[in-house]
């Protein structure tokens, strides 16, 4: 396993991060702890979770994932684990989370951090991320910015400024409750604004951005790759298997998260997702890879990806996902991937 610098932080994270969003829904606590133990035995030191998890989010399961992770974490040497979690943002109809998170402001940030610390049974969070932006942006399958959608057209409302968000996060950093901060599902303007405000007012600097990145969603490359490189903001790539679509199981009539939770991952319900997934699966098999190995190896070894977040619902899946780390792709195969990319350009934005 490789370990890489997370932005300008003092953290060295494993190149593979264990995601946890199935814990408490598709995985029991015992299964989750087995995964965590195995992953750490293989050299992973980085866990990603969120107050909103498990998915799909619902009141009946809210808090389960962080609680399960916390029950494991309390038996570990804390400084050997790099723990990341996230605050749920506004406008996602999650009324059971803190009474409905209507803003990423001082009050909500403090309540969210305190809740996560309690569930995770720890005194501090290594990387605290804003799960999605406070402001109106296209995300989770949307692909066009529409200013008329700001607060559903309510012109009296204002989103919490980046300055106010950073000031609230700075207080939590100063108190030792969080060490570093990051963004998620963010766009170029947001990243640069967080960097600008942090520099101007001497507030905490973002270390990372956690965005979707895979063979059928390479939107990060258009505007964020250069920003990440020049500003030293690390990419944490989530959904490398595109919610299972890049394993080819849905092409073969199999079941999984996309079939169990229809409508949850709308970005993968686009017209060319099946066609592009089939083309990548065919390419993988022609070169002696499984479709999942090709998809994972592609993301694992991109020069701008600091850590790839993987998730599994079984130990077999987890073992296969980690084994793909040992199978980098040849120049010939990477060239063939680029040809398919030109034919099926980002079908799952």
What spans do the regions from the language model cover?
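N-terminal binding-site loop/beta-alpha segment at the start of enzyme catalytic domains
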Residues: 1-86, 106-111, 123, 174
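Aromatic/hydrophobic pocket-lining residues that form the small-molecule binding cavity
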Residues: 32, 65, 109, 113, ...
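N-terminal small/glycine-rich loop or linker at the start of catalytic domains
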Residues: 7-23, 84-99, 129, 136-144
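Beta/alpha (TIM)-barrel catalytic core signal, keyed to glycine-rich beta->alpha loops juxtaposed to Asp/Glu
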Residues: 133-339, 344-348
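Active-site mouth loops of central-metabolism enzymes
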Residues: 20-30, 95-107, 153-160
């Amino acid at each position: 396993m490789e370990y890489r610098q997370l932005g300008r932080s003092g953290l060295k994270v494993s190149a593979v991060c264990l995601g946890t969003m199935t814990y408490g829904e598709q995985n029991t606590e015992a299964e989750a702890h087995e995964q965590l133990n195995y992953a750490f035995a293989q050299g992973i030191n980085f866990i990603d979770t969120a107050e909103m998890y498990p998915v799909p989010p619902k009141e009946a399961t809210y808090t389960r994932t962080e609680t399960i992770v916390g029950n494991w974490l309390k038996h570990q040497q804390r400084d050997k684990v790099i723990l990341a979690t996230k605050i749920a943002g506004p406008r996602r109809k999650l009324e059971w989370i803190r009474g409905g998170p209507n803003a990423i402001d001082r009050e909500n940030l403090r309540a969210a951090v305190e809740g996560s610390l309690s569930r995770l049974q720890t005194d501090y969070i290594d990387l605290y991320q804003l799960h999605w932006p406070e402001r109106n942006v296209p995300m989770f399958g949307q692909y066009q910015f529409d200013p008329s959608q700001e607060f559903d057209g309510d012109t009296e409302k204002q989103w919490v400024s980046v300055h106010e968000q950073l000031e609230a996060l700075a207080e939590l950093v100063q108190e030792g409750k969080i060490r570093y901060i990051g963004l998620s599902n963010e766009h170029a303007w947001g990243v640069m604004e967080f960097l600008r405000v942090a520099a101007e007012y001497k507030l905490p600097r973002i270390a990372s951005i956690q965005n979707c990145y895979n063979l059928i969603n390479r939107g990060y490359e258009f505007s964020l790759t250069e920003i990440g490189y020049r500003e030293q903001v690390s990419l944490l790539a989530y959904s490398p298997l595109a919610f299972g679509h890049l394993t080819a199981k849905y092409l073969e009539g199999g079941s999984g998260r996309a079939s169990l939770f229809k409508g949850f991952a709308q970005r993968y319900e686009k017209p060319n997702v099946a066609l592009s997934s089939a083309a990548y699966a065919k390419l993988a098999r022609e070169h002696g890879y499984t479709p999942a190995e090709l998809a994972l190896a592609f993301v694992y070894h991109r020069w701008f990806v600091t850590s790839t977040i993987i998730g599994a619902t079984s130990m077999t899946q987890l073992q296969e996902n980690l084994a793909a780390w040992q199978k980098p792709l040849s120049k010939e195969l990477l060239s063939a991937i680029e040809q398919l990319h030109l034919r099926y350009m980002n079908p799952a934005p």
